[in-house]
Structures are given as C-alpha cells and as structure tokens.
C-alpha cells in the first residue's frame, strides 16, 4: 500500500472497522469515515487525526480514497453506491485486514465465542514479551483502544459469522469453538459453517490451535488441541476460580505449568487462556511473560465490566447475547459472588438469533436469581412479532427463576426501585443496553435496616449481649441502619437505639411499639445462645412474621442444638462420635437404679453428664462416682428435658472449626483452632473468662500434623453438607495423642465476643469483620428469597386450583 493512499470507512464507529482505522492511522495513512452516531470510539479516532462525518452522504467519499465497508453495510447505502459509481476501490473490511497483516507474522482467532478475549490475551502476552504487536480486536481494552500498529506480529479476530474468513491465510490461528450462531448466513446449515472453519484451518501456514473438547471440531480439523480432554496437546490438568480470578495447571510437551493465575472468571476463560498460551508457547514466548500477562490482564470492555461507583452493590456489563455465552457468564459471576442476589437484565440481540436459539434461551439463566427481560435490539433487522410474556414464562420455567418483562424505557426506574444493598446486576446483550450501566453509575440503593436481637431467657444471656455489642462495632454505616431488640431474662422485649442504654425491663413482643419497630426492619440478626434463640424457636418466629434473618435456619438450628440427634445421625453416616448413652426424663424417673447400673457397666469414671440442648459448657457435669452421677443427672434434667452421659475425653485436645454459608451450595470452612484450659474440663466461666477466671487459651497454630488437620477439616465439611447447614456454625471435636478424633457437638450461633475464636478464624483467613457480617446478611437474604419464591408459587397453584 502506498503512503499517499486515503481510506474512508462506511460505519467507522463499528468495533471491527475502528480497529482497522487505528492501524492505518498508526501507519501514517489518511483516514476518514462516517457513522450514524458519534461516540467514544469515534472520539479516539478523531484524536489520532481521522476525519468524521455524521450520517451517510455521497459527498463524504474523498476523491481517490479506498472505501471500506463491512457485512452490516447495505449495498444501497448512498456512500457505497457513490464509491462504486465514481470508480473508487471498494473493499470489504476482511480484505483490508488481510492486506494489513500480510507483511507480519499473522495470528488470527476465530470461532463462535471467545474471539475477543483470546486475541486480547495473545496481544497482552506479546506486549509483555516486548514484541510490540499490531492488533485489530473486536473489543475495547481498558484504554478504549481496539487496534494499533506494531512490528513483528499481527493479532486479529477473524469473523466467522459472514464467511469472510475465506480471505485469510494466517501463519498461526486459533479456533475457539463452534456453536449454532449466525446460521442464517449459512443457509441454516451448520455443516456449511463447519466447512468454512475447516477451510480456514487448512489455509493456516504453520499451526492451527483448536478446542479439543469440541467434538465437531475434533472430527474434522488437523492441528494442535487445547482443552480438558487428556488427549489434548495442551492439557488442562486442573482449574478453580477464587473470587474474580482463575487458576489452572496445564501440561504441554511434557512440561507442567502449575497454578497459572488469570484475572478472569469462568471455565470458558480457562479455555480461552489455554488457547492464548498455546499460541505463545508455539512462538517461543517465555513462560514468565505468559504468567505476567495473564496475572495483569486488565480485561476487555463489555466483558463483565464494572460500571457503577457504589460500594454497596455491583453493576456489571457483559456482551453475552447467545445462550451459551449467557450461561457461562452467569455461572462465572455466581462462582465469584456466592450467595449475593444476581439480577440479570437481558436484551435479546437480533430477531434472527432469538428465533434460531429459541429452544436454548429459556435455560440459560439458571445462575441468576431474577431476570428482567426487555425488547429485542434489532440491529437493523425487520421487527418480528414476539410475545415477551411467553418468553419470560419460558425462562421462569426452564431456569427456575423469576423472570419479568420490563419495557426498555422503564428499566432504569425499575432497577432504581428494585436494587438493594449487596445485589449484583448483570446487563446482557450486544445492543444499546450498554447505556444502562452509565445511567446507574452514581446510583445508591437505600441502606438495609438491620435489627439485632440479643439477650434472651437462656443462662447465656450475658454472652449474647457481649456478642451483640461486638458485632455492632463492626457494622458498616454505608450499608446498614441498625435497631436493637434486647430480650430480658424473663422473655420481655425492649427496643433501644443502643445496647449501652438498655435497661433490664421490657414489653411483650405483641406490644404495638415492639411490633411496629420489628416491621421496619429489613433483616434480623439473632445473636442468641441456647434455648429460645439458637434452637429454631426464634428462627420459626421470624419466618412466621416474614422477616429475613441471618445465621442458622429453623431445621439446622433445631438439629445442631440437639446433641443426641446430631450424634446419632452422624454416627450412622460414618462420622466418629464420642460414645454416649441418651436418657429420657420419663425413663429416668421410673428406673433410676436400672439406668445407673447400665451407665456404670458401659462407662468408666470419670463420666460426663450433659444437657442435650444447651451450650458447649452449660449443663455439663464431670462425675467420679455413682452418687455424683445421680445428682448430676437430676441437675441436668432441671435444665433440659433431654440428657445424655458421655465417655470422658480428658487429656484430648479440644479442636473447633468455624463455618459460614449454605451447606447445600456455597460455604466456607475456616481453619481449625484449639481451645486449651488450665486443666481438665473447660467450664462456662473459664471459657469466657467470667467470675474471676482466666479465659481458656485459643491456639490457632496447633501442633497437630497437617494430615490430621486435613482429616478434621474434611470431616467438618462433610458434617455441614450432610446436615444441610445454613448460616453459621462451630463444629467441635476431641483429638487424642494418636490422632484419633471424634465429633463432640455443634453450635449453630457461636459466641461472637471480642475473644471468641469464631470471628478470629475468619479474620485469620483474610476476611474483615465487615465481610463476616456482610456474609451473614447475604446468606439470610438469599434464603429468604428462595422461600418467598416457593410461597408465591404455592399461591399461584392455589389460584389455578380454585379456578
């Protein structure tokens, strides 16, 4: 190409066209272009010297200019017709791309999904390796640039959608995958699409890397493969996602590349990173450059790009518009955010795509909690008659989520009324839904009104209040407003603005003042220990009045606080428990001597007598003879209707494990710790440092072997899963000198005072106090949402039954 040539782009603001315009401008060519609107993409080009025309007019075509068009430009476009009639050279953007890349080592990326991410990753690797590549990519980097001219290499996307990949003969290539996308351009025949990809691979001069996990590609392509399948040339051995980052280990040519970190999310991006890595290794790029590029990758705009400034909720924008892309994106977000409510705002892109994929779209939203469906963005297609209500119903049915049709012009207002603290909003689509995030950039949702309930009728009243005071110190004022409800030892309620001003007096929970203040609360934090607070009673009350609450759910509270039931259930499932013998009040009253004889025969003194429903150090008695045994059992039955005797584990380590989350989904097991007393059994006073006693020592760096620690953590994980744990829990074990361990008991609402190890366990894991509270609130809200969905469904069923 001659230096004096002038290039004019019809539709210069398009993502593919603007990339080539950047390359030409960097190489010193004169560039002009037209488009129907002027945005940030055009502004970047103008800053480089491009001339811009708003709208399409014949007179925009410069004399002697090469005129560039894309497949989206109509042959009836006035500028296209003018260029033809004047005799200007008119080229498709694919032809120009091929020309621009011909004097460099070209690396072209094609496939139904992932082209932009793979080409961006390859570009980042080459830049990290100081190779200064040229690039033309279908997405903007964080600087708003999608094209540029360099030296040795040229990285570009090759658009498979319109068949224009026939123009390319790259040195290296990547085929990411194949899906039923853009089939209308291939006479509705997926085999024609596959044939075009096969031809592209055959024309690759050196190496074609393709997805070895894709059967349709594997059946007809030759080249190097990447994927999870063990037969792949670049074999992904393992991967996991931690927050907003991926880690994977891969093997290529007998070399294992362990724990590669990528600043992306989702299994699909593991494959994308593997494809980029395969190209880089083929080019002889140093492993360090690959790792550094992946670790520092800043991403691509409109690929889970954060749009809002508020710290109390998250608004992400994503380009996903095909069912496969939507599913992968939402699954990645779910893994990153755990139990936070995900609101998916979906704008279908093109009537033809919706029609072609109508059977796949309804099931693509399974990882969302709620879907807002708006009108199709036509992208120039003729409008078709669509029943959005029926599509919303299909999404609700197949993805098991609430889906509502919201007209596009009402989306902003609806979201401003619906978004709450901790929500994650994800806009999905390739159309003008891009504007939604900008409109909500500075939006702030209302704070959540938390109601902390503490005190209670239990003998652990004092610890409950201390725990509540400690939690109150760490509540984020930007997230929450707080009210306090102190339950007296007599069971009366007092509503106060501060626990420091609380008096030991109160009213019935049915008193209008208490009821009205409870009504204003959005989420309740019950920080209660023992009966009437930790055993499901309070949880049942809160569900009855329709309030979300943190911590354990009804069933889990009731089960975990019943030590006999927990032991019996866990023992049946293979978890070792300390040998025990349950007693009933009726049986004990009628046949005390018989039970005493049975106990003495089964156990050796000292023996422990325990109440089944109280805390770990409440209603527990160490006895050394039959007289003490009888008295202790009588005393225990004064505190609880269910009592058991237990073989002693004196001399064993007391090991505790803290857990937060949903046992049927996402939960976190913190590292274990040891509670050491002054000797023998750790009673209530020593546990909390009361009555002049020194607190039991908490040891986090225990001298247990790594193997034993892992076994205990695995057991805690298993116990929480099997019991379908909800909210929070502390799981206690005994461990002897040989490394044998037994489940002791579970505490669904552990102490949360300044010295309580439950909170410290998560602090040592890298959490903040605020994060712990956030997690408790998020878990409670998510559980409430799930229950509300079931309630509303039952009402619908009843309505249909009545009709």
From Swiss-Prot:
Its EC number is 6.3.2.8, 6.3.2.4. Mg(2+) 1 binds at residues 732, 745. Its main location: cytoplasm. It catalyses: UDP-N-acetyl-alpha-D-muramate + L-alanine + ATP = UDP-N-acetyl-alpha-D-muramoyl-L-alanine + ADP + phosphate + H(+); 2 D-alanine + ATP = D-alanyl-D-alanine + ADP + phosphate + H(+). The lineage of its organism: Bacteria, Pseudomonadati, Chlamydiota, Chlamydiia, Chlamydiales. The gene is murC/ddl. Residues 447-803 are annotated as: D-alanine--D-alanine ligase. Keywords: ATP-binding, Cell cycle, Cell division, Cell shape, Cell wall biogenesis/degradation, Cytoplasm, Ligase, Magnesium, Manganese, Metal-binding, Multifunctional enzyme, Nucleotide-binding, Peptidoglycan synthesis. It is an enzyme of class 6 (ligase). Residues 1-446 are annotated as: UDP-N-acetylmuramate--alanine ligase. The keyword Glycosyltransferase does not apply. HAMAP family: Dala_Dala_lig (MF_00047), MurC (MF_00046). Mg(2+) 2 binds at residues 745, 747. It comes from Chlamydia trachomatis serovar D (strain ATCC VR-885 / DSM 19411 / UW-3/Cx). Binds 2 magnesium or manganese ions per subunit. Its cofactor is Mg(2+); Mn(2+). One of its GO terms (cellular component) is cytoplasm. Cell wall formation. This is Bifunctional enzyme MurC/Ddl.
């Amino acid at each position: 190409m001659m230096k004096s040539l002038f290039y004019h782009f019809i539709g210069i603001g398009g993502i593919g066209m603007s990339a080539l315009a950047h390359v030409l401008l960097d190489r010193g060519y004169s560039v002009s272009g037209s488009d129907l609107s002027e945005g940030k993409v055009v502004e970047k080009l103008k800053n480089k010297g491009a001339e811009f025309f708003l709208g399409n007019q014949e007179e925009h075509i410069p004399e002697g200019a090469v005129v560039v068009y894309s497949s989206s430009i109509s042959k009836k476009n006035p500028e296209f017709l003018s260029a033809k009639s004047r005799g200007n050279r008119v080229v498709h953007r694919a032809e120009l791309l091929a020309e621009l890349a011909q004097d460099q080592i070209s690396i072209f990326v094609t496939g139904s999904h992932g082209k932009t991410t793979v080409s961006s990753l390859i570009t980042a690797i080459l830049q990290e390796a100081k190779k200064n590549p040229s690039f033309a990519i279908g997405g903007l980097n964080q600087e708003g640039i999608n094209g540029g001219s360099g030296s040795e290499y040229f990285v570009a996307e090759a658009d498979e959608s319109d068949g224009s990949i026939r123009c390319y003969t790259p040195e290296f290539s990547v085929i990411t995958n194949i899906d039923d996308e853009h089939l209308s351009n291939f006479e509705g025949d997926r085999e024609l699409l596959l044939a075009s990809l096969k031809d592209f691979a055959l024309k690759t001069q050196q190496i074609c890397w393709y997805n070895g996990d894709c059967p349709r590609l594997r059946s007809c392509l030759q080249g190097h493969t990447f994927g999870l399948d063990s037969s792949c040339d670049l074999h992904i051995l393992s991967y996991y996602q931690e927050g907003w980052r991926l880690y994977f280990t891969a093997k290529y040519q007998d070399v294992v590349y362990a724990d590669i970190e990528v600043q992306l999310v989702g299994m699909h991006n593991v494959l994308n990173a593997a494809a980029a890595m395969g190209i880089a290794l083929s080019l002889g790029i140093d492993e360090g450059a690959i790792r550094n590029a992946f670790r520092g990758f800043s991403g691509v705009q409109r690929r889970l790009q954060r749009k809002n400034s508020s710290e109390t909720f998250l608004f992400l924008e994503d380009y996903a518009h095909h069912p496969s892309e939507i599913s992968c994106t939402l699954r990645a977000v779910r893994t990153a955010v755990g139990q936070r409510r995900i609101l998916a705002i979906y704008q279908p892109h093109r009537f033809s795509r919706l029609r072609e994929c109508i059977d796949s779209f309804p099931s693509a939203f399974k990882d969302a909690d709620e879907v807002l469906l708006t009108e199709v963005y036509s992208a120039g297609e003729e409008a078709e008659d669509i029943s959005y209500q029926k599509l919303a119903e299909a999404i609700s049915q197949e993805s098991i989520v609430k889906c509502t049709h919201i007209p596009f012009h009402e989306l902003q207002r609806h979201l401003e009324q619906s978004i709450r603290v901790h929500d994650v909003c994800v806009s999905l689509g390739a159309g003008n839904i891009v504007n939604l995030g900008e409109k909500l950039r500075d939006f702030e949702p209302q704070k959540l009104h938390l109601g902390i309930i503490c005190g209670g009728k239990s003998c652990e009243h004092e610890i409950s209040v201390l725990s509540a005071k400690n939690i109150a110190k760490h509540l984020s004022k930007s997230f929450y407003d707080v009210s306090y409800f102190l339950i007296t030892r007599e069971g009366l309620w007092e509503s106060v603005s501060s626990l420091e001003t609380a008096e030991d007096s109160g009213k019935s929970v049915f008193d209008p003042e208490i009821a009205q203040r409870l009504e204003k609360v959005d989420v309740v934090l019950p920080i209660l220990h023992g009966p009437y607070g930790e055993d499901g009673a309070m949880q049942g009350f809160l569900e009855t009045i329709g309030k979300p609450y943190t911590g354990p759910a009804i069933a889990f509270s009731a089960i975990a606080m019943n030590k006999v039931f927990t032991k019996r259930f866990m023992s049946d499932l293979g978890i070792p428990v300390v040998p025990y013998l349950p007693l009933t009040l009726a049986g004990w009253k009628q046949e005390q001597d018989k039970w005493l004889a049975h106990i003495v025969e089964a156990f050796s003194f000292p023996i422990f007598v325990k109440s089944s429903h109280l805390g770990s150090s409440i209603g527990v008695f160490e006895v050394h003879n039959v007289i003490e045994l009888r008295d202790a059992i009588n005393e225990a039955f004064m505190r609880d209707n269910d009592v058991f005797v237990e073989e002693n584990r004196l001399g064993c380590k007391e090991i505790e494990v803290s857990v937060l989350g949903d046992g049927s989904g996402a939960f976190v097991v913190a590292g274990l710790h040891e509670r050491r007393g002054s000797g023998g059994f750790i009673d209530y006073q020593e546990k909390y440092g009361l009555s002049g006693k020194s607190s039991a020592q908490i040891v986090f760096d225990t001298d247990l072997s790594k193997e034993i620690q892992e076994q205990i953590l695995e057991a805690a994980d298993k116990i929480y899963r099997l019991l379908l744990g909800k909210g929070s829990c502390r799981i206690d074990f005994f461990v002897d000198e040989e490394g044998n361990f037994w489940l002791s008991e579970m505490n669904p609402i552990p102490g949360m005072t300044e010295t309580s190890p439950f909170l410290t366990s998560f602090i040592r894991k890298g959490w903040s106090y605020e994060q712990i509270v956030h997690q408790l609130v998020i878990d409670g809200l998510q559980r409430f949402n799930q229950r509300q969905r079931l309630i509303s469904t039952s009402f619908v069923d009843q309505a249909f039954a009545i009709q």
